């Protein structure tokens, strides 16, 4: 599968073994980054191969060693910043495509589920198994909230409604993470 944004084409790949992933990344003449390579429980292997359209047939690769858990890594593209955020295992990593470097890394308290980008507020909500973390588009943490296993998220204006498995629902202000009375 290919994704095109700004001056880049991204090919998403899945590999059966770490050896295959490393070989694929070794073919990237513009360099590569391997995320979570030190994990002892890696089970699944993914890559995003980036080809800047202005540089001909040259490639930059980002590989992910995932623990499996039944959750595939997610990526969130921010064309204005030329950045890709990767969410996997218990981590979110932002990669700057201009300088091909890790821009930020955020450790999570529980398994990553998905991103909720809020462009108008310049905020990205990171939904995890039992937490929500709000960050800026540049990766600066704004707030965290955790209570129980999250079963549903709903956004209305500047309010984030959360349903939990065994706890009562909560409503948070998206901008500061404070509880809001409903």
Q: Predicted segment positions?
A:
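Extracellular-facing segments of soluble proteins and assemblies that are Gly/Ser/Thr-biased and enriched
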Residues: 75-106
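Short loop/turn segments that connect beta-strands within the blades of beta-propeller domains
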Residues: 80-81, 88-90, 119-120, 128-130, ...
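Repeated scaffold domains used in trafficking and secretory/extracellular systems
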Residues: 7-9, 13-37, 61-81, 107-121, ...
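Acidic, small-residue rich beta-repeat scaffolds with periodic aromatic anchors
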Residues: 2, 154-182
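A short beta-strand motif characteristic of beta-propeller blades
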Residues: 57-67, 101-107, 139-146, 178-181
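Short polybasic amphipathic segments
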Residues: 44-55, 133, 160
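Hydrophobic beta-strand positions in blades of beta-propellers and related beta-sheet-rich domains
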Residues: 47-49, 92-94, 131-134, 169
């Amino acid at each position: 599968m290919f994704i095109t944004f700004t001056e880049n084409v991204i090919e998403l790949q899945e590999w059966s073994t770490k050896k295959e992933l490393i070989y694929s990344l070794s073919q990237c003449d513009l360099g590569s980054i391997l995320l979570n390579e030190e994990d002892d429980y890696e089970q699944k292997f993914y890559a995003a191969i980036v080809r800047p359209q202005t540089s001909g047939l040259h490639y930059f690769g980002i590989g992910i060693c995932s623990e499996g858990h039944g959750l595939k890594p997610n990526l969130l593209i921010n064309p204005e910043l030329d950045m890709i955020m990767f969410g996997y295992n218990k981590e979110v990593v932002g990669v700057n495509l201009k300088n091909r470097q890790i821009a930020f890394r955020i450790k999570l308290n529980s398994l990553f589920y998905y991103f909720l980008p809020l462009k108008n507020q310049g905020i990205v909500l990171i939904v995890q198994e039992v937490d929500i973390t709000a960050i800026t588009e540049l990766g600066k943490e704004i707030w965290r909230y955790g209570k129980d296993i999250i079963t549903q998220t709903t956004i209305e204006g500047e309010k984030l409604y959360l349903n939990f498995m065994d706890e009562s629902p909560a409503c948070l202000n998206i901008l500061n993470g404070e509880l809001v009375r409903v």
